[in-house]
């Protein structure tokens, strides 16, 4: 019963003397007036092939909406206030390792950019210039700047979000992929697949601090809370490397499996930073690293070519985007088992969770 209809019924019952029903309806009216937003959180998935965003409700663990975005949505991050989601869009055709790029269709540069998705409106409201072939990025702590990797241009671009313009581009290693800010927001770390390096950029000055070698096809970076240590995964080495971020050099490899069979992709720290979760691509698993010993501490099956991953707000559930099978695995971290697989559209890639 709608508010106005209920109010009319209350008036009629008051005049008719139906006190019991009147009391019941008043109670219902108060409940309607005091109702709040549904509890829970939402999981947002970029789908690279179908060019859209899947929105999953945590209560039902089902897709509640699918919103078109543009070509090849991959990297995804939320603004610090959680009101906006940014998505990297690319008009460049997919180019798997070993493929002669001269045989591919020409890139659609008009499709390159950063999509701006309004969480409250549940739609994309704007497109920012993102440089050539944007893939992954991070957002400044004040929410004013995006730092994005431009894979086919070997650089990281700084985007002024309010103006929607690129303010500068810093040269990095070849084919930059992962981009991550240090916890204090002062430095930007960019991994480069082509030459196996990590570039360190001063965020305020917009200058290159250092570039150093790590391993073959480094993908992503994650920092420990102290920012004195970081981890970077090397896809073609089947390993994760521990970094000394004070010296900006590699400390030790953490071997997860046979190179080629295990391809480390996404990284996510547990809420207490005691465990590092690593998706393994064609390995079909998530590996667990104990950050106190920096040794592997087990693994569990999740699905076909898991890529992006994210934790629930309470840290008890892990979500992985599984590209070839077009689904998202819901993992109970207490038992390390998949409790559900949620179908999305084409080629799920990145994951963000918002409360």
What is the predicted function of each stretch?
Residues 3, 18-19, 304, 346:
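Intrinsically disordered regions, especially transient/low-confidence alpha-helical propensity segments
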């Amino acid at each position: 019963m709608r508010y106005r209809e209920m109010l009319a019924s209350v008036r009629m019952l008051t005049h008719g003397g139906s006190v019991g029903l009147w009391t019941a309806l008043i109670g219902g009216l108060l409940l309607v007036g005091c109702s709040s937003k549904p509890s829970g959180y939402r999981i947002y998935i970029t789908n690279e092939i179908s060019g859209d965003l899947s929105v999953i409700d945590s209560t039902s663990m089902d897709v509640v909406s699918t919103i078109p975005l543009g070509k090849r949505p991959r990297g995804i991050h939320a603004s610090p206030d959680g009101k906006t989601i940014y998505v990297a869009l690319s008009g460049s055709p997919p180019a798997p390792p070993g493929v002669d790029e001269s045989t591919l269709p020409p890139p659609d540069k008009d499709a390159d950019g950063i999509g701006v998705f309004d969480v409250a409106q549940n739609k994309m409201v704007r497109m920012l210039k993102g440089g050539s072939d944007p893939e992954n990025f991070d957002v400044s702590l004040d929410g004013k700047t995006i730092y994005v990797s431009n894979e086919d241009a070997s650089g990281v671009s700084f985007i002024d979000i309010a103006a929607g313009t690129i303010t500068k581009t810093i040269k990095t290693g070849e084919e930059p992929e992962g981009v991550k800010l240090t916890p204090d927001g002062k430095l930007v770390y960019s991994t480069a697949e082509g030459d196996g390096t990590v570039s360190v950029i001063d965020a305020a000055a917009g200058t290159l601090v250092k570039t150093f070698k790590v391993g073959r096809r480094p993908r992503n970076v994650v920092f420990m809370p102290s920012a004195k240590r970081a981890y970077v995964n090397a896809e073609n080495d089947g390993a994760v490397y521990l970094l000394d971020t004070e010296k900006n050099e590699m400390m030790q490899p953490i071997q997860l499996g046979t190179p080629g069979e295990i391809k480390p992709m996404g990284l996510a720290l547990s809420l207490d930073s005691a465990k590092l979760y690593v998706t393994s691509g064609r390995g079909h698993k998530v590996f667990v690293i104990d950050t106190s010993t920096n040794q592997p501490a087990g693994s569990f099956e999740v699905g076909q070519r898991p890529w992006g991953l994210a934790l629930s707000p309470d840290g008890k559930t892990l979500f992985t985007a599984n590209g070839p099978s077009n689904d998202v695995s819901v993992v109970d971290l207490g038992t390390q088992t998949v409790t559900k697989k949620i179908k999305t559209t084409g080629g799920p890639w990145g994951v963000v969770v918002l409360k």
